[in-house]
Amino acid sequence: MLLPYMETGRIEAGCDEAGRGCLAGAVFAAAVILPEDFKNEDLNDSKQLSEKKRYKLRPVIEREAIAWAVGIVSPEEIDKINILKASFLAMHRAIEQLKVRPEHLLIDGNRFTPYPDIPHTTVVKGDGKYLSIAAASILAKTYRDDYMNELALEYPAYHWLDNKGYPTKVHREAIRTHGITPYHRKTFTLLPEQLTLGF
């Protein structure tokens, strides 16, 4: 059973990212503030939910949340600052768009660059522990999936409809055959010997 809040009586936002381990595309993050009495049996770690269920939950989260927002960091920015910093920047961009200012941040993972004047707590595997992080995970993943599905129409050879930019065998083989696209992260490009060895 996921916990609604770490500490009641304060406005708490859950934050999570999607696309950190991808070879292509932007990294997305979401921040969600849920009411203290929010309940939903279907809401769990978004990685364990089917795609259909995630998309079914997205409008429920958006409708019932006190506030929610999505932040995006482009592949070009990722190459400039590295993927870890890009993940934190995406979260910061989501937080700064919230229409209600949170008093505390619940961050999925074990590290975070502090957001100005808002205390935070990092929670390893937080999307399996707190409702607000699980909700943020669903928003980040579904909005990023929508974005990758759009890019897939432009570059069908990379099968992004299926792999969403993650380093699957099919995706790696497509890079070996066709080279990289403007949406590939240059700092993530696999070396020829890695492609040959099947890493």
Curated annotation (Swiss-Prot):
Compartments in which it is found: Cytoplasm
Molecular-function GO term, any one: manganese ion binding
CDD domains referenced in this protein's UniProt entry, alphabetically: RNase_HII_bacteria_HII_like (cd07182)
Annotated residues for binding of a divalent metal cation: D16, E17, D108
CC annotations in GO: cytoplasm; ribonuclease H2 complex
Domain RNase H type-2: from-to ranges: 10-199
Cofactor: binding details: Manganese or magnesium. Binds 1 divalent metal ion per monomer in the absence of substrate. May bind a second metal ion after substrate binding.
Enzyme Commission identifier(s): 3.1.26.4
Cofactors demanded by this protein: Mn(2+); Mg(2+)
Function comment: Endonuclease that specifically degrades the RNA of RNA-DNA hybrids.
Sequence similarity: Belongs to the RNase HII family.
Identification of the protein by name: Ribonuclease HII
Record organism: Parabacteroides distasonis (strain ATCC 8503 / DSM 20701 / CIP 104284 / JCM 5825 / NCTC 11152)
